[in-house]
Curated annotation (Swiss-Prot):
GO terms for biological process: mismatch repair. GO terms for molecular function: ATP binding; ATP hydrolysis activity; ATP-dependent DNA damage sensor activity; mismatched DNA binding. SUPFAM superfamilies: ATPase domain of HSP90 chaperone/DNA topoisomerase II/histidine kinase, DNA mismatch repair protein MutL, Ribosomal protein S5 domain 2-like. PROSITE patterns: DNA_MISMATCH_REPAIR_1 (PS00058). HAMAP family: DNA_mis_repair (MF_00149). This protein is involved in the repair of mismatches in DNA. It is required for dam-dependent methyl-directed DNA mismatch repair. May act as a 'molecular matchmaker', a protein that promotes the formation of a stable complex between two or more DNA-binding proteins in an ATP-dependent manner without itself being part of a final effector complex. It comes from Rhodospirillum rubrum (strain ATCC 11170 / ATH 1.1.1 / DSM 467 / LMG 4362 / NCIMB 8255 / S1). Belongs to the DNA mismatch repair MutL/HexB family. This is DNA mismatch repair protein MutL. Keywords: DNA damage, DNA repair. It comes from the Bacteria. Gene3D superfamilies: 3.30.230.10, Histidine kinase-like ATPase, C-terminal domain (3.30.565.10), MutL, C-terminal domain, dimerisation subdomain (3.30.1540.20), MutL, C-terminal domain, regulatory subdomain (3.30.1370.100). InterPro entries: DNA_mismatch_repair_CS, DNA_mismatch_repair_MutL, DNA_mismatch_S5_2-like, HATPase_C_sf, MutL/Mlh/PMS, MutL/Mlh/Pms-like, MutL_C, MutL_C_dimsub. The gene is mutL.
Length: 629
């Protein structure tokens, strides 16, 4: 077969196979054209998931008859003032979208240029172009696509159900709306409006957060921290959710480069690196990041649908993202997402039909009026059996601010021994003013695991092990950053730890790196190592358990060389073993010291595995649980 030139219609259909993969692809191209035309409002309507009809109407600059005719010609565009493909300041630049769509569908364009007295319409069917004709239309452009893929029916077999195709279009419009908050968007399926976004006003940073909240939900905007950094001409802005607000997949991660939504593996790798010691391995951060950089530093012409880009210096971009995210997370301090408290409140709400009797809201009981019979019985029984002089814990409205004798009485009622009286010279509970601290004043400990603290307007419940684990880890990281190693303490009796032979070899091979972290180990024959020094921060730790966990981690992380890149994981493992354990009873002053350390420590809102370290319940929410509000 001899080589021949393909006819223009076939060329356009081949291009359409790359550019217009599905109805959402056509929506993307048409909406990008509208944004490039300076539109402040874009309305999209889809019928039958876009198969039957796609309508995009904008109020942009519009086109005159000559431009209208050129717009449907292949590689005709107004967006490249020169011949430099690296000097691109618009979303579109190839001039492929309209001719590609027109080659596989019935396309009608109606447009009126700014300042023009008349509108013009042009039709393209299966690649056959008509002539511009006078029409009626306000300033802007109206693009109607009917019978998508009618000229290439084989493509229709690959489309999903109409609802699925509609959802793909919703995702496309959401991404473009995040990138351009000043533009208003609507998307309808002909019967129901699925997107309605007004153009956000004011400063760009706040406008973006408003738009993100409208799309990702109020929970995201309530739990988002601002990201802002710049390095070597690259500016990074955006918002990232606190680690305790996360998702099971990376679908909640959005990257925009010079206003263009892109999907880039670089983003996911950088985000994972930034969140590695504050997020569980099976959870993913939620964020939207905006990169603004000179056009010559990024190539946007590497993907048919322009969904991917290539950076001239990907290492610089990755470092900027990781550094900015880590700095913002550290600046957030002990803050945890509101979803943690909401989840706790949801678990506390009495379930209708459960075995426990439920009080009607606002009826009797704890707020005055007729008391609950069960409480009256318990109060009478308590008065008859309690030791003489023990105060009535039900007297007044609560147990008292300091959790003193009333607390002891309640402990006795629960079967626990009363709290020992304070000895001479023993520190008193913190003054009432301690409630003004962000995490409040410690009032007690339950199950020797959870610290109960009272704030000015609520209650904080702290997981003492998770919280101390984060404190130890941050101290070790700070020591590494300042001195290059962690202070060590010599064991009076070296500890011999038996492992399987491969595990012992892995630990012994990593001895130099582990020594920087304060753990001095040596090989001790086949299947064993001897530990001579441990990090001083860990105190009295379970050496055998620590080394066993490190051996398992090294099997997952790889060689000792790879260990240098996984120091965060090693430090997290050590911190876990060196922290206050669940089941250890603490004194009030120890609890308060832990709370104050949390307030001063970055990333203290979550442990090294990404779990929350505390839950805060507002007084108003607690009162609603008991029908007081």
């Amino acid at each position: 077969m001899t080589i021949r030139l393909l006819p223009p219609v076939l060329v356009n259909r081949i291009a359409a196979g790359e550019v217009v993969e599905r109805p959402a692809s056509a929506v993307k191209e048409l909406v990008e054209n509208a944004i490039d035309a300076g539109a402040s409002r874009i309305d999209i309507t889809m019928t039958d998931g876009g198969r039957a009809r796609i309508l995009v109407v904008d109020d942009g600059r519009g086109m005159d008859p000559g431009e209208l005719s050129l717009a449907v010609e292949r590689h005709a565009t107004s967006k490249l003032p020169g011949d430099d493909l690296l000097d691109i300041h618009t979303l579109g630049f190839r001039g492929e979208a309209l001719p590609s769509i027109g080659s596989v569908a019935r396309l009608t364009l109606t447009s009126r240029a700014a300042g023009a007295g008349d509108a013009w319409a042009l039709t393209v069917e299966g690649g056959a172009k008509g002539e511009p004709e006078p029409a009626s239309h306000p300033q802007g452009t109206r693009v109607e696509v009917r019978d998508l893929f009618y000229a290439t029916p084989a493509r229709l077999k690959f489309l999903k159900a109409p609802r699925t195709e509609q959802m793909h279009a919703v995702d496309v419009v959401h991404r473009l709306a995040m990138a351009h908050p000043a533009v208003g968007f609507t998307l309808s399926d002909g019967t129901r409006q699925q997107i309605r976004l007004s153009g956000a006003q004011g400063e760009l940073f706040e406008a973006r957060l408003t738009r993100l909240g409208a799309i990702l939900g109020r929970e995201f905007s309530d739990n988002a921290i601002a990201i802002e950094a710049e390095r070597e001409g690259i500016r990074l802005t955006g918002h990232a959710a606190l680690p305790t607000y996360n998702k099971a997949t990376s679908a909640g991660q959005y990257l925009f480069v010079n206003g263009r939504p892109v999907r880039d593996k670089l983003l996911h790798g950088a985000v994972r690196g930034a969140y590695q010691d504050v997020l569980a391995h099976d959870r993913n951060a939620v964020l939207a990041l905006y990169l603004d950089l000179p056009p010559e530093m990024v190539d946007v012409n590497v993907h048919p649908a322009k969904a991917e880009v290539r950076f001239r210096d990907p290492g610089l971009v990755r470092g900027l993202i990781i550094g900015a995210l880590r700095h913002a997370l550290a600046a957030a301090g002990h803050r945890a997402s509101s979803t943690v408290s909401l989840a706790a409140l949801g678990a506390l709400r009495p379930a209708q039909g459960s075995g426990a009797p439920a009080l009607p809201w606002g009826a009797g009981g704890y707020g005055g009026g007729a008391s609950h019979p069960g409480l009256e019985e318990r109060r009478s029984a308590y008065a008859a059996q309690a030791p003489a002089g023990t105060p009535d814990p039900w007297a007044g409205r609560g147990m008292g601010a300091g959790g003193g004798s009333g607390q002891a009485a309640m402990a006795w009622l629960a079967g626990a021994p009363p709290a020992a009286p304070r000895l001479a010279g023993e520190p008193e509970a913190p003054p009432t003013g301690a409630e003004d601290f962000p995490l409040g004043a410690a009032r007690g400990q339950i199950h020797d695991t959870y610290i109960i603290a009272q704030t000015r307007d609520g209650v904080v419940i702290v997981d003492q092990h998770a919280a101390h684990e984060r404190l130890v880890m941050e101290r070790m990281k700070a020591a590494l950053a300042e001195r290059g190693e962690v202070a060590r303490q010599i064991l009076l009796l070296p500890e011999v730890v038996e492992l399987d032979e491969p595990g012992a070899v892995r630990v012994a091979t990593a001895a130099a790196e582990l020594a920087k972290l304060g753990l001095v180990v040596e090989g001790f024959g086949p299947g064993a190592v001897v530990v001579r020094e441990v990090p001083a921060l860990l105190g009295d730790t379970d050496v055998k358990g620590l080394v066993a966990d490190l051996a398992e981690g090294l099997a997952e992380w790889g060689t000792a060389q790879a260990l240098e890149d996984r120091l965060g994981d090693v430090v997290a493992t050590m911190a876990c073993h060196g922290s206050v354990r669940a089941g250890r009873r603490l004194r009030i002053e120890e609890m308060n010291a832990l709370l104050r350390d949390m307030e001063r420590t970055p990333r203290a809102g979550q442990c090294n595995h990404g779990r929350p370290t505390y839950v805060e319940l507002r007084l108003g929410d607690i009162e609603r649980l008991f029908g007081r509000r």
